[in-house]
Amino acid sequence: MLNEQTMHKLYAMKLSGMAESYEEQRQQSQMGELSFEERFAMLVERQWIWKENRALTRRLKYAKLKLDACIEDMDYRHPRGLRRSTIEQLVSCEWIKYHRNCIITGPTGAGKTFIGCALAHQACREGYRALYFYTPKIFRQMAIAHVDGRITNLLKKISRVDVLVIDDWGLATLERHQYRDFLEILDDRHGSGSTLITSQFPTSAWHDIIGDPTVADAILDRLVHNAHKIELKGESMRKKKKRGDEITNAAEDDRKEKKEKKRRPDPSDQGSDNANLGGKA
């Protein structure tokens, strides 16, 4: 009865991790060999892990990352200019702590979005809030927000996150209201948040994308001067993966065909057997 009351109170206080650990301890006889301090430490540790996992789940849900990418899945095998030392430096999230930016450029399919999402995922692990936007989508949302009067709230939401991910920047030349909105976002975030940009185009081409030289200078000043840069090169990772899958499938088909041939009886052997049978008759 006392145990049931204790469990009820733990759940009522939202200490689910501690309650689960307590229930496990009750069912394990060897727990009696541990001291009270050791058992209590186990309860607290489980509650801490439970709380941290819940918080991480909320941060990832809020971030709305395009890809379920993480640092552990980073591929360094292909020669595309991705240095392990650069990623290891960014994994520490010091760049976020000091409100620096990150710019990832390279051809289509080079893995820019994957790397960007992996770094944002790592930021969420470290307790930072991230928010992902595909470039056309963020401008579309801002255009709608201007019409229905939500633009102030939207800009406030964007400015408050620790890491803002803008994916596929520069797909089209910006219109006047777009680059002004974007400058306002960067101005609000300058010195208080980190922005991660992925783009097919090098930063030297961004003046043409923005259009207005004065605004372009202001945007690049806020984005580029304190940014970590990852410049990817080479063939599309998607094409390489597809080609690798095709080779793997072809090899698998070849193995299956050879296996099938071994199982299939040789017609010449059957003819020889029939001849022998005829001779005996």
Q: Where in the sequence are the language-model features?
A:
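Walker B motif beta-strand of ABC-family P-loop ATPases
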Residues: V163
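Interdomain "pre-motor" coupling segment immediately N-terminal to P-loop NTPase/helicase cores
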Residues: Y11, S16-L67
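Conserved P-loop
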Residues: L82-R160
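Short hinge/gating elements
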Residues: H8, E24-Q28, D73, N101-C102, ...
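Extended interfacial segments that mediate partner engagement and assembly in macromolecular machines
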Residues: N53-T105
